[in-house]
Amino acid sequence: DTSSLIVEDAPDHVRPYVIRHYSHARAVTVDTQLYRFYVTGPSSGYAFTLMGTNAPHSDALGVLPHIHQKHYENFYCNKGSFQLWAQSGNETQQTRVLSSGDYGSVPRNVTHTFQIQDPDTEMTGVIVPGGFEDLFYYLGTNATDTTHTPYIPSSSDSSSTTGPDSSTISTLQSFDVYAELSFTPRTDTVNGTAPANTVWHTGANALASTAGDPYFIANGWGPKYLNSQYGYQIVAPFVTATQAQDTNYTLSTISMSTTPSTVTVPTWSFPGACAFQVQEGRVVVQIGDYAATELGSGDVAFIPGGVEFKYYSEAYFSKVLFVSSGSDGLDQNLVNGGEEWSSVSFPADW
């Protein structure tokens, strides 16, 4: 029965589920920003949190600069654009303007902040381990909209910093937020990037070779692998075991073709929990004994560790953002069974 698989809010215990884009998802507002929590600590066994942030343009920072000592934070731009700043220790401060499909990696103890640029912006945050949503429950106001609007329109002044003020943010250490109020975001961005010697939307981006360093991958400009075992799937890793270290997870996008009639859709099962959010196309997922369910843009499927699942693309081209607990999940299996690939599109023939 599909109806029992689909939920309006992430469950308070670990079970398979699908949650639609812009579901209530225990939404809260923090000033003009609206946060939804599609996967939470309790729903994932504290493996990871997957949250959506929708917000309008702002002339000010979305949050004051801070670090996390225990949580590895990932920023993915679904649509619109936002600027992300990150600095590790005494290293050079980095900043990029992220647009659709771009990714920013903020490991533990990296000072960071962001600013929403476009009126129709959505960020997906993947935070490891799970449970970081408790901060937003504490800071935010429960959203009570009945239309599932991406964010609640406001005529408020967009020039003041969103989120907790300097005195409040300094009291949030129990939520793993450590204010870095002396951090000054650099303002010398040219063509979406600073410092000047950095590559952004003009050439290849690599994942960090040194664990703990922040890094950025522009849409389509990172490493890619083509798996041809079950139709075509292109895995673009964002976080591997090298970067995750003891946080023990992987993060990728997976772009997929339809499944040829000669191929049987495989059944998968992994020790760690995993989830994916559809970014483009239509993806059918069948989890455990639940009926097959079609997911559209923004929809999220969560699969607990040890539960069998199948998935395939109903559209000619679909793309998902995929997170897995552990270092040997679906994305890594597809990479291991594939080959390095230079294109974002799959071959023209089977």
Swiss-Prot record:
Binds 1 copper ion per subunit. Residues 146-205 are annotated as: Linker. Its cofactor is Cu cation. Gene3D superfamilies: Jelly Rolls (2.60.120.10). Substrate binds at residues 66, 73. It catalyses: quercetin + O2 = 2-(3,4-dihydroxybenzoyloxy)-4,6-dihydroxybenzoate + CO. Performs the first step in the degradation of the flavonoid quercetin by a dioxygenase reaction. The enzyme catalyzes the cleavage of the O-heteroaromatic ring of the flavonol quercetin yielding the depside 2-protocatechuoyl-phloroglucinol carboxylic acid and carbon monoxide. This involves the remarkable dioxygenolytic cleavage of two carbon-carbon bonds. Cu cation binds at residues 66, 68, 73, 112. Pathway: Flavonoid metabolism; quercetin degradation. Its EC number is 1.13.11.24. One of its GO terms (molecular function) is quercetin 2,3-dioxygenase activity. Residues 1-145 are annotated as: Cupin 1. Keywords: Copper, Dioxygenase, Glycoprotein, Metal-binding, Oxidoreductase, Repeat. Inhibited by diethyldithiocarbamate and kojic acid. This is Quercetin 2,3-dioxygenase. Glycans are attached at residues 90, 109, 142, 191, 248. Residues 206-350 are annotated as: Cupin 2. Residues 152-167 have a biased composition (Low complexity). It comes from Aspergillus japonicus. The N-linked glycan at Asn-191 consists of Man(5)-GlcNAc(2). Residues 148-167 are annotated as: Disordered. Homodimer.
